[in-house]
A protein has these predicted regions:
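A short acidic, often aromatic-flanked loop/helix-cap motif at beta-alpha or helix-coil junctions
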Residues: 16, 64-66, 183-189
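Conserved short-loop catalytic and cofactor-binding motifs
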Residues: 8-11, 74-76, 89, 150
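S-adenosyl-L-methionine-dependent methyltransferase catalytic module, highlighting the catalytic core
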Residues: 96-229
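Conserved SAM-binding loop
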Residues: 24-126, 222-227
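Conserved phosphate-coordination/catalytic loops
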Residues: 13-18, 92-96, 156
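Short N-terminal helix-initiation segments at or just after the protein's N-terminus
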Residues: 1-5, 86, 93, 160-167
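Amphipathic alpha-helical segments that form well-ordered structural scaffolds
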Residues: 22-26, 48, 161-169
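Class I SAM-dependent methyltransferase Rossmann-like catalytic core
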Residues: 1-28
Length: 229
């Protein structure tokens, strides 16, 4: 996997609309021709991509969605190689059919697939250090809430698990992962000061040697896949 970062953005975000601006700024070089946004939610990417004179289609459930689609119901109703780039942000972790959906993203794309996945280990680590997510639930999208949730994550995994999964499924579908990065991966766990150094040392002593303690502070991870010629 290429560690050089071809795609980056200096924009900060604090909610979904500002995150869409960051993602567009980061990947605009390959958001060309035609883009399929799988799980487009409130279509935050739509205006940004259309402003570049690029065809954009958003599917899933959400406000002003182009096509309402149950993403558990596969295959998706699109021809193979019908979009230059396929986006799938914050979606796969919600699906029972994660592996089949991954194959569909690769089938529909003519060149690029961009995927994001959360880091549940980081969320769990934060709960241990800082407390529960809310009064009613220890972790967002996990746990055993009293009321049946409208939505939840189906999978619990580490950043290393996610990297391995994406790499293997990409290879299976004749793609190469040309970039992987994560929110917060430029700053080591606990920061660069003495406190951070001591904290990382303690964790290395407490945890198994193969645990990447720095990854416990990483947020969402992003993967850019390119179809092999």
């Amino acid at each position: 996997m290429n560690k050089l970062r071809k795609f980056s953005s200096e924009l900060k975000f604090h909610d979904r609309p500002t995150r869409a601006h960051m993602l567009f700024d980061k990947y605009k070089e390959i958001l060309t021709g035609s883009v399929l946004d799988v799980g487009a939610d409130a279509m935050y990417m739509q205006k940004l991509i259309l402003s570049q004179d690029v065809k954009y289609v958003g599917i899933g459930y959400g406000e002003n969605i182009d096509f309402e689609v149950n993403l558990e119901d596969l295959p998706l109703n699109f021809e193979s190689n019908s979009f230059e780039t396929v986006l799938c942000f914050d979606v796969l972790e919600h699906l029972e059919n994660l592996h089949q959906m991954f194959d569909e993203l690769c089938r529909i794309s003519d060149k690029y697939v961009i995927i994001s996945l959360p880091n549940p280990w980081k969320d769990f680590f934060s709960v241990l250090l800082k407390g529960d997510y809310s009064i009613d639930e220890s972790m967002k999208f996990y746990g055993l809430p009293v009321q049946m949730p409208k939505d939840r994550h189906r999978w619990f995994f580490s950043e290393s698990d996610a990297i391995r999964l994406i790499s293997e499924l990409a290879k299976k579908n004749n793609y190469t992962v040309i970039q992987q990065d994560s929110d917060g991966d430029s700053l080591p766990l606990g920061g660069r000061g003495i406190y951070g150094m001591v904290a990382r040392l303690i964790l290395r002593l407490l945890f198994r040697k193969d645990i990447n303690t720095c990854a416990l502070s990483h947020g969402t991870s992003y993967y850019v896949l390119q179809k092999n010629e």
